[in-house]
């Protein structure tokens, strides 16, 4: 697809892309802290998407270090579960990463992700009520 979007021939056939589509959309690769896809996301694609749902803080740290070491530019962590009404407990670095805790702790945990170098975060929220979304936004300090 990337070759087609650049108006290059693929298997001996050239399809002229419309001028407004040349270059195509950004392509981001989603993977855990893998040895294959993270370097490819950094060198061949427009970004990498890590999953907070099935990762530990240690794995998120390992993945972003690998991605940046290969020259990766845009890194997103997605599926970060948020529940600001959940009891606040310890979250060991080798345990599942989440923001299921009080607001202050969620802000601290989120800051750790930002400090690792992730450019964007996508949260999974319990509902889409204005009050909930305002509280979630407070995690980011915006």
Where are these regions (language model features)?
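Active-site-adjacent structural elements that line small-molecule/cofactor binding pockets in enzymes
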Residues: 1-142
């Amino acid at each position: 697809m990337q070759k087609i979007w650049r108006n290059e021939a693929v298997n001996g056939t050239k399809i002229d892309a419309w001028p407004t589509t040349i270059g195509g959309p950004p392509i981001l690769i989603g993977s855990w802290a893998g040895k294959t896809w993270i370097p490819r996301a950094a060198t061949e694609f427009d970004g990498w998407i890590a999953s907070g749902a099935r990762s530990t803080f240690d794995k998120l740290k390992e993945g972003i270090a690998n991605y940046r070491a290969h020259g990766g530019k845009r890194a997103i962590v997605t599926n970060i579960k948020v529940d600001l009404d959940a009891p606040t407990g310890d979250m060991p670095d080798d345990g599942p990463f989440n923001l299921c805790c009080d607001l202050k702790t969620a802000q601290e945990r989120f800051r750790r992700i930002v400090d690792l170098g992730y450019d964007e975060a996508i949260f999974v929220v319990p509902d889409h009520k204005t009050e909930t979304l305002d509280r979630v936004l407070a995690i980011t300090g915006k």
